[in-house]
């Protein structure tokens, strides 16, 4: 292996610095900068398997597999280093290379890092050794892939999928798979008892700190907080301090999302904790709301009606109920006078929209949809907390819940497309149900397509492998026995926008909508098939299966009216019979997470979102790097580059003739958001957990509260579980859509995980001082009795120090509001 001299090192560094700043306008410069960075790092990485084992063997939980197959591994790794797959990896641009060395490659003694080749060897070796350790898991793999016999053929199976990047793993898996005593779960959910000061202390110092130490994103339910008479802001600041401590000097920042229901007496103070003008804000954490459908029904039908607030100690069973049972309990408590305050429901919506526009959150989930579509009945123990990215849903009161994530790189499933990976076997053996399905999507490519279509066979192969990868991480890397036994899996995707563009379609074209549903139906079907095989051969069926809806022949899509299936119902029925007979290893299957971290490695678009920008920046641990849309620049004609560079790649700013040529590369901000919501609804029947559905608004649209409020109502009407993950705002003054650094006042998550750490996902830019009207807190005891004891008959109390208006013609206008200072502002 060639090494670099001091002079060469300096020269390479200067060349990289010169080239990387051109990445958004010169794709060749981006590729060259990435290749040079790999060359620059060659001196500090391991070169042979023998050297790798010498440096890292004391870190492995199973060194024996690597030692036993050392020579064979050297052969595989050497062949990979000369392969087209490796060439694609090192040619994926500067940000991809930076991400490897900055985050994913394991560091050993004396600062020696594993090489990219050995990184993939470690991941595949972990999966292979785990598969060989569990005889049932190996038997299931051989049932799915009968051609696999020897240990090294098991290794090859995982190695080929990982190095071809058809299967991409979460950040915890990529960083710690194979490392002794590591937790590989991406998400941790907990709803602790917060009813007393002692309970809060236990929850924070005994449990939360441990979860953050394990470098996982955490979702915490805080609806039960405040019963001890303390302000919720105190609890939020304590959580924020925990996060900031654990993130100091850390390669992979983590965070916490705190979830509350909107009937809580301190809901306004809860929302306030993220507002940039709040000098005690909590920039390191995120807020989320589990909103009952009653709230949306009242806002839509009678927006001036009262919304009642309750102290959690007087709220009866509100926290544990949903649907009609929740409504009955809510009105029973109101009739009994148990409420401690009331506010116009418009006023509360004002505050929610205000916070979303200025801080990007709260994340908003529909309580009924999350609970009613779960695999068992949750009435009386309803979920009211999700994970850090609002796509993983599990009950978490009785024990901590976890989820292991992976995702499929959809562009690798294109037929004859550049960078596509061809299947290496004939589909004549394996799971008979999967073999009965079509190999290609019937949706035909459009004009300008670079591929001949989308390969459903490759998608199913990748989904099957991802299910085995997640099974390995569950069996060897779960933090508790309870979470391991539940075997919650979340399979997502990246590069959906790339697929549509490569097939010649705009994101919301009819063919895109058709393939959108088809992809997730086949993923859900394949994950169920594979999980059933694993359960049969390992004899590990998740607890509660016999009481689950699956045991009665149920599928998640049964609960969604009007679901069109591309897989014949006869084949679904055969799968149902198999599951009823053999059970399931996993309790959950599909969760569409943000994939910012691993999408940077592959150079694909993030998750299932439309393109965020064609030329943007990304903040890493060490620098702010340019991030070009590689699919876009691959399709740009040479004679169009200058015009596109002038507008930062923004298609909407081009002259009409040129704009028409590149319409399929419009950004998420250019599309009608209701169309994007509808596409989320189309795939929802096959997403048994949830999807991190974000909204993308232009600044002029976000300046009207009605825009965002109407979109939230529309998502509710369509029954989405996650109504809104982020609210992202495109600044009107920007000539190019740029993902900028968060200001000192704001900190927005970064994403991993396949991930989740919203510490990599940059927040929407804050708007100028709040664009929303509404009270910060209204705790009235009766009609017209305000926070300071003053009365405004027939009006709604608003502290003028917090009153900031939308346009006068806004749906959420402020007619009838009366201004005066509340007691705390006088």
Curated annotation (Swiss-Prot):
Transport listed as a keyword: no
Residue numbers spanned by region Disordered? 747-769
Example GO molecular function? ATP binding
The SS bond pairs are 187-403
GO BP: any one term: deoxyribonucleotide biosynthetic process
Record's keyword terms, sorted? ATP-binding, Disulfide bond, DNA replication, Early protein, Nucleotide-binding, Oxidoreductase, Viral latency, Viral reactivation from latency
Locate the compositionally biased regions of type Basic and acidic residues. 749-758
Q: Where is this site: Interacts with thioredoxin/glutaredoxin?
A: 822, 825
Name the Enzyme Commission number(s) assigned to this protein.
1.17.4.1
Q: What does this protein do?
A: Ribonucleoside-diphosphate reductase holoenzyme provides the precursors necessary for viral DNA synthesis. Allows virus growth in non-dividing cells, as well as reactivation from latency in infected hosts. Catalyzes the biosynthesis of deoxyribonucleotides from the corresponding ribonucleotides.
Query: What HAMAP family has UniProt attached to this entry?
Result: HSV_RIR1
- Name the protein family: Belongs to the ribonucleoside diphosphate reductase large chain family.
User: What's the protein name?
Assistant: Ribonucleoside-diphosphate reductase large subunit
Organism ancestry = Viruses, Duplodnaviria, Heunggongvirae, Peploviricota, Herviviricetes
């Amino acid at each position: 292996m060639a090494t670099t001299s001091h002079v060469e090192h300096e020269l390479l560094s200067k060349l990289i610095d010169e080239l990387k700043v051109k990445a958004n306008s010169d794709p060749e410069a981006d590729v060259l900068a990435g290749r040079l960075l790999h060359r620059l790092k060659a001196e500090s990485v391991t070169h042979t398997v023998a050297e790798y084992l010498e440096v890292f063997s004391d870190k492995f939980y199973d060194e024996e597999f690597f030692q036993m197959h050392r020579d064979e591994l050297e052969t595989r790794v050497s062949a990979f280093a000369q392969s087209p797959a490796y060439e694609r990896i090192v040619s994926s641009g500067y940000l991809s290379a930076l991400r490897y060395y900055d985050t994913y490659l394991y560091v050993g003694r004396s600062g020696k890092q594993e090489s990219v080749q050995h990184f993939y060897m470690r991941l595949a070796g972990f999966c292979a050794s785990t598969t060989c350790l569990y005889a049932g898991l190996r038997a299931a793999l051989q049932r799915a892939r009968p051609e696999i016999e020897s240990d090294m053929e098991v290794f090859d199976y995982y190695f080929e999928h990982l190095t071809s990047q058809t299967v991409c793993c979460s950040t915890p898996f990529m960083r710690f798979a194979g490392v002794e005593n590591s937790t590989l779960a991406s998400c941790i959910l907990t709803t602790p008892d917060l009813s007393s000061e002692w309970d809060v202390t236990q929850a924070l110092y005994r449990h939360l700190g441990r979860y953050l130490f394990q470098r996982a994103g955490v979702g915490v339910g805080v609806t039960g907080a405040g019963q001890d008479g303390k302000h919720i802001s105190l609890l939020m600041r304590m959580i924020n301090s925990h996060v900031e401590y654990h993130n100091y000097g850390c390669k992979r920042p983590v965070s916490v999302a705190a979830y509350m229901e909107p009937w809580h007496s301190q809901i306004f103070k809860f929302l306030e904790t993220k507002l940039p003008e709040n000098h005690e804000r909590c920039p390191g954490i995120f807020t989320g709301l589990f909103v009952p459908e009653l709230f949306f029904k009242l806002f839509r039908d009678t927006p001036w009606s009262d919304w009642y607030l309750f102290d959690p100690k007087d709220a009866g069973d509100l926290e544990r109920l949903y649907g009609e049972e929740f409504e009955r309990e809510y009105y029973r408590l109101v009739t009994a006078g148990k409420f401690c305050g009331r506010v116009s429901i418009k006023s509360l919506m004002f505050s929610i929209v205000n916070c979303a526009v200025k801080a990007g959150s709260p994340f908003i989930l529909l309580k009924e949809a999350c609970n009613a579509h779960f695999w068992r009945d949750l009435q009386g123990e309803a979920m009211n907390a999700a994970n850090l990215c609002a796509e993983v849903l599990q009950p978490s009161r009785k024990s901590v819940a976890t989820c292991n994530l992976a995702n499929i790189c959809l562009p690798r499933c294109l037929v004859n497309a550049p960078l596509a990976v061809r299947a290496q076997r004939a589909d004549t053996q394996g799971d008979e149900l999967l073999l009965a399905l079509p190999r290609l999507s019937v949706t035909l490519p459009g004009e300008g397509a670079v591929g001949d279509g989308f390969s459903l066979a490759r998608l199913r192969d990748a989904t099957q492998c991802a299910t085995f990868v997640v099974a390995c991480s569950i069996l060897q890397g779960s933090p508790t026995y309870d979470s391991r036994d539940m075997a919650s899996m979340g399979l997502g995707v990246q590069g959906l926008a790339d697929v549509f563009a490569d097939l010649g379609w705009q994101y919301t074209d009819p063919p895109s909508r058709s393939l959108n549903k088809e992809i997730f139906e086949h993923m859900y079907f394949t994950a169920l098939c594979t999980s059933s095989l694993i359960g049969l051969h390992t004899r590990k069926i998740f607890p509660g299966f016999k009481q689950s809806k699956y045991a009665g022949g149920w599928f998640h899509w049964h609960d969604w009216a009007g679901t069109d299936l591309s897989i014949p119902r006869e084949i679904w029925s055969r799968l149902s019979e198999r599951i009823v007979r053999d059970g399931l290893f996993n309790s959950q299957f599909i969760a569409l997470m943000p994939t910012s971290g691993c999408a940077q490695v592959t150079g694909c678009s993030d998750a299932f979102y439309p393109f965020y920008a064609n030329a943007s920046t990304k903040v890493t641990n060490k620098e702010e790097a340019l991030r070009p849309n590689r699919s876009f620049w691959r399709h740009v004609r040479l004679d169009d580059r200058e015009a596109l560079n002038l507008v930062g790649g923004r298609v909407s700013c081009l002259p009409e003739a040129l704009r028409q040529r590149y319409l399929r590369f419009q950004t998420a901000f250019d599309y009608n958001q209701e169309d994007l919501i509808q596409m989320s609804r189309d795939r929802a029947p096959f997403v048994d957990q949830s999807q991190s559905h974000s909204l993308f608004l232009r600044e002029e649209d976000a300046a009207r509260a009605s825009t965002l409020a109407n979109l939230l109502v529309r998502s509710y009407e369509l029954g989405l579980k996650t109504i809104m993950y982020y609210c992202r705002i495109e600044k009107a003054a920007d000539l190019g859509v740029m993902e900028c650094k968060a200001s000192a006042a704001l900190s927005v998550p970064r994403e991993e995980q396949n991930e989740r750490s919203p510490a990599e996902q940059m927040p929407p830019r804050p708007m100028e001082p709040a664009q929303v009207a509404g009270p910060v807190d209204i705790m009235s005891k009766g009609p017209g009795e305000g926070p300071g004891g003053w009365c405004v008959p027939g009006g709604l109390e608003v502290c003028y120090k917090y009153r900031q208006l939308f346009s006068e013609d806004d749906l959420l206008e402020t007619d009838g509001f009366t201004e005066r200072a509340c007691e705390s502002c006088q």
